[in-house]
Amino acid sequence: MDASDTPTHPAPHPADPAATPYGAPTTPPRPLRSRFTVRDVAAAKNRGEKWSMLTAYDATTAAVFDEAEIPVLLVGDSAANVVYGYDTTVPITVDELLPLVRAVVRGAPHAMVVADLPFGSYQGGPAEALASATRFLKEGGAHAVKLEGGSRVVRAVDALVGAGIPVIGHLGLTPQSIHTIGGYRVQGRDEAGEILLADALALEAAGAFAVVLEVVPADLATRVTKELRIATVGIGAGSGCDAQVLVWQDMAGLSGGRTPRFVKRYADLRTILADAARAYRADVRDGRYPTIEHSY
């Protein structure tokens, strides 16, 4: 090939997705707004300003949600289900979650990234919790951690906060305890509501900056929200919480089968992706792809 045959297209900018073979993101864009922090959570509570949280498990999705100004991204142990294909959240490990945390942090320069402490990484007590949480901040780049349980994890929360690690608690339906609570059902009814409130207050006293309330009666969640100085994050807990969180595949309609009652689908991504994949398969089969415009 002589010089006249050499392509003359300008080299793409290093931050341009086209600069990589598969259109994957390279370095995140320079932040134009500051990263959301624990102080912002407290300020929003004081102003009565609601905020949103979504799960994320990879850099590309994290970048999309960061662009949409979702302030908090949770690398949840729900990755056990939606990434690794486990039936419950119980099997996932710290080592399986850490690469996902790193990816989300790289993709989201503005969001607070929260890492779930998986089952078996903190139940042994404060020392185990501190070792696990430290890995997520030091090796993963997370900005906070989340753990399930009330009074039984208060000592662990106190140790984490004392070490400078921001903590979100999680009450109500706690999926890591699914074998104990006997299934996915509403928690906190009747006298159990008083126990949940006491647990929430105990987490607040231990230094947690927020608490997730999952699948609890809306009136109970509203009461807890009013009683606490820290933020409440609802998932199946009504509109009275300070914030809301959803698994992004549920929110975007990518999950298959029935979704929980509390999920609102904002798109039908499963159908869109399936249709796109079928169209691609048909084009390849019938010789319609690639064409000259897709060739060098």
UniProtKB/Swiss-Prot annotation:
UniProt keyword annotations, A-Z: Cytoplasm, Magnesium, Metal-binding, Pantothenate biosynthesis, Transferase
Cellular component terms per the entry's GO annotation: cytoplasm
Pathway: Cofactor biosynthesis; (R)-pantothenate biosynthesis; (R)-pantoate from 3-methyl-2-oxobutanoate: step 1/2
Transmembrane annotation, as ranges: none
Any one GO biological process: pantothenate biosynthetic process
Essential cofactor(s): Mg(2+)
Location of the protein in the cell: Cytoplasm
Residues at which 3-methyl-2-oxobutanoate binds: D77, S78, D116, K146
Compositional bias of kind Low complexity: 16-25
Active site: E214 (proton acceptor)
Molecular function as annotated in GO: 3-methyl-2-oxobutanoate hydroxymethyltransferase activity; magnesium ion binding
A Pfam family: Pantoate_transf
Cofactor note: Binds 1 Mg(2+) ion per subunit.
Positions that bind Mg(2+): D77, D116, E148
PANTHER family referenced in this protein's UniProt entry, alphabetically: 3-METHYL-2-OXOBUTANOATE HYDROXYMETHYLTRANSFERASE
Family label: Belongs to the PanB family.
HAMAP family: PanB (MF_00156)
Function field: Catalyzes the reversible reaction in which hydroxymethyl group from 5,10-methylenetetrahydrofolate is transferred onto alpha-ketoisovalerate to form ketopantoate.
Name of the protein described by the UniProt record: 3-methyl-2-oxobutanoate hydroxymethyltransferase
